[in-house]
């Protein structure tokens, strides 16, 4: 440019114009790409919403809705088996259990319960856990040493968990009436009523103040039953996912297997300090675990129509079953067996041993002819 003192100033103008035009073109392209990006994002969100709606639609479709209803009803029937012991155990909490005859009848039931617990662990829960682990192995091969060790570790974890819970929560004592001991309750009542006593003396000393002790072992047994019912819900729902016929057969098999088991659990709750109706209500509350298990099995079912239990449900059952086994072993060997070892009469000890074997034999028969 003439008159400009700076060398090369003539080239600065065209360069400036070129850069300005390039910047404007980039801005126009960016502005034009924003609608495309927005449309792509909208399309992706729509696809995700469609997939979610399709999954919920498949989960609540007509065929799957029948599976939901049948599975929940089957799991509820298994949970309602907890009221069966009310029909076969004529024991009441109170004076009858404190009598010698009532205590002996309870020990007989506990002997049967011990055999049922051991049979349930070694003939039902652990074999089922091994079966789930084998089915989860790649290629359908057998269990590896590491998988077997994991099952053993889960059993130990169940035992230690129940031990820690019993250490943490000490036995709670509920006193119906807390009074200072008085040698002559009639005289005390007369003093409070101006010298006139209208109360009759108790027929038996010691019945005026009722002290009821609820042991932690009862709550631990309820926890183990809830987890056990969760696995039953998994099995019932997985069977109904295959067909209604297999689902009904599985439900009936679990019901037949649970009846002697519920009788033993009922005896353990009576031993822990619950009365008959409280024990029955708490047994019914464990049915919630079965409903949760059935819902979990159906919700984790593969949407591609693969029958049977989903991999997530199989993996859950593979550790829940041995963990529950450890809990039942702890209850049987730590809470029930010591009471039976206190018996010194040889004839009664033999009866307890025979009842223990009877509980195991019942579980063997159900495992052979039902499962």
Curated annotation (Swiss-Prot):
Induction: Up-regulated under zinc-limiting conditions. Induces by TGFB1. The chain crosses the membrane at residues 8-28, 69-89, 109-129, 150-170, 236-256, 279-299, 317-337, 350-370. Residues 29-68, 130-149, 257-278, 338-349 are cytoplasmic. Residues 1-7, 90-108, 171-235, 300-316, 371 are lumenal. Pfam families: Zip (PF02535). A motif (XEXPHE-motif) lies at residues 257-262. One of its GO terms (biological process) is connective tissue development. PANTHER family: ZINC TRANSPORTER SLC39A7 HISTIDINE-RICH MEMBRANE PROTEIN KE4 (PTHR16950), ZINC TRANSPORTER ZIP13 (PTHR16950:SF16). This is Zinc transporter ZIP13. It comes from Homo sapiens.
